[in-house]
Curated annotation (Swiss-Prot):
Superkingdom per UniProt: Eukaryota
UniProt protein name: Poly(A) RNA polymerase GLD2
A Gene Ontology molecular function term of the record: metal ion binding
InterPro entries: MTPAP-like_central (IPR054708), NT_sf (IPR043519), PAP_assoc (IPR002058)
The organism of origin for this protein: Rattus norvegicus
Length: 484
């Protein structure tokens, strides 16, 4: 991607290097994304209605690779795959409203490892400690189990499934983003040697579409000695340097770089090779944590991903899915869907943070958060509602049942809870709790006109869909497919 900038010929002169002691510490965070080989082999969904998550492999490498070997000239490192015997035990998983439901939790036995959840990243780590961070070693990854999509027994459910299968992010889309991330990490490490660049958001959380942008988090201070970067001063300074080099040194590969001085400043840019738009922030590490929390929810129940993707498409079509214009962010929309599925009389989703607090605690170090999806078995709900019924129920819930004035959406608690009386919440029209840091993810909705527009769209869409039971009545499928 950047052929003249990595292998023996850095694009930045020594005068442009950072010599501040603040960034001169040797890196200790061994990112799960170091030179990931994005080996995805998605199955044909037309025949089997199944999506297979493919193995990725990673290992320890030096922050800046200067080898001239062909191995580091953009070619993939391929691990031998081994076949493992499937073995498991049965375990009880309690539904809050009914008798315990029996599910199969596949537990590793006799050295064999296989999970019923599709692990995106999975590795053993060497027990020896290097500055408090266990280094990773490259190993073969297991073939993940196929995730079958739900059956569609009515027209509306069939439309939802077909739109999902057409618009969901493909293996090639993720591979493009990962290759760009890996190359940019090497470039940025020439400025900040201890930094790591993480791909976060919808690209990894299971809710991405083919048209989804890429979100990147640059971590320049690492755990266990991690502390927050001041977003108004340090983050802006770091991003100013990154933006400058994007403009001057990488202009042949990156176009339209913009430094956005928001509450959480970002650099927006477009990669000319992959044609993907990216947003890059600094040390917004909660985004790394919630990426893997949402990924676990995405694959916990097979109706979640199709429902979320169609609702995001619906919101975008009606122009209520743009935080920069005072409406809902995609993240807030996803949390709203998860919350609805948690609050049904027979829930389709539980609260993962309550059931697995050790896996989704903020005390879990960043280099370990990717283990969480591997440790959670599927949740088998007794709720047999179709995708069409769930979409209708979602619209009805927020149109007629949820109390916007007094309640806050909480996925962490798996219920609507009273709004806090703090200033941060008092004057906001919509309150959606961020599961890790407790902030309001819907704070962008600060105008009554936009709030009324959002509520009105929920009500009108619910009424139309209830009468016609045709997705085209609220989301023209042809237009949605073209914007996939």
């Amino acid at each position: 991607m950047f052929p003249n900038s990595i292998l023996g010929r850095p694009p930045f002169t020594p005068t442009h290097q950072q010599h501040n002691n603040f960034f001169a510490l040797s890196p200790t965070l061994y990112s799960h994304q170091q030179l990931i080989d994005a080996q995805f082999n998605f199955q044909n969904v037309d025949l089997s209605r199944a999506v297979s998550l493919q193995p990725l492999t990673y290992g320890t490498v030096s922050p800046i690779q200067t080898s001239t070997s062909p191995l580091f000239r953009g070619r993939k490192r391929i691990s031998d795959e081994k076949a493992f015997r499937l073995d498991g035990k049965r375990q009880r998983f309690h539904s809050p409203h009914q008798e315990p439901t029996i599910i199969n939790q596949l537990v590793p036995l006799s050295g064999d490892r296989r999970y019923s959840m599709p692990p995106l990243f999975h590795t053993h780590y060497v027990p020896e400690i290097v500055r408090c961070v266990p280094p990773l070693r490259e190993i073969p990854l297991l073939e993940p189990r196929e995730i079958t999509l739900p059956e569609a027994k009515d027209k509306l459910s069939q439309q939802i499934l077909e739109l999902f299968e057409t618009c969901q992010q493909q293996a090639s889309d993720l591979k493009k983003k990962e290759l760009c991330r890996a190359q940019l990490q090497r470039e940025i490490q020439l400025l900040f040697p201890q930094s790591r660049l993480f791909l976060v958001g919808s690209s990894l959380n299971g809710f991405g579409a083919r048209s989804s942008d890429g979100d990147l988090c640059l971590v320049v201070k690492e755990e266990p000695c991690f502390f927050q970067v001041n977003q108004k001063t340090e983050a802006r300074h770091i991003l100013t340097l990154v933006h400058k080099h994007f403009c001057t040194r990488l202009s042949g590969y990156i176009e339209r770089p913009q430094l956005i001085r928001a509450k959480v400043p970002i650099v927006k840019f477009r990669d000319k090779v992959s044609c993907v738009e990216f947003d890059l922030n600094v040390n917004n590490t909660v985004g790394i944590r919630n990426t893997f929390l949402l990924r676990t929810y995405a694959y916990l129940e097979n109706r979640v991903r199709p429902l979320v993707l169609v609702i995001k498409k619906w919101a975008s079509h009606h122009e209520i899915n743009d935080a920069s214009r005072g409406t809902l962010s995609s993240y807030s929309l996803v949390l709203m869907v998860l919350h609805y599925l948690q609050t049904l009389p027979e829930p389709i989703l539980p609260s993962l943070q309550k059931i697995y607090p050790e896996s989704f605690s903020t005390s879990v170090q960043l280099h370990l958060v990717h283990h969480a999806p591997c440790n959670v078995p599927p949740y088998l709900s007794k709720n047999e509602s179709s995708l069409g019924d769930l979409l209708l129920g979602f619209l009805k819930y927020y149109a007629t049942e949820f109390d916007w004035n007094t309640q806050m959406i909480s996925v962490r608690e798996a219920k609507a809870i009273p709004r806090p009386d703090d200033m941060e919440w008092r004057n906001k029209y919509i309150c959606v709790e961020e599961p890790f840091d407790g902030t309001n993810t819907a704070r962008a909705v600060h105008e009554k006109q936009k709030f009324d527009m959002i509520k009105d769209q929920f009500l009108k869409s619910w009424q139309r869909l209830k009468n016609k039971r045709d997705l085209n009545s609220v989301l023209p499928l042809r237009a949605a497919t073209l914007k996939r």
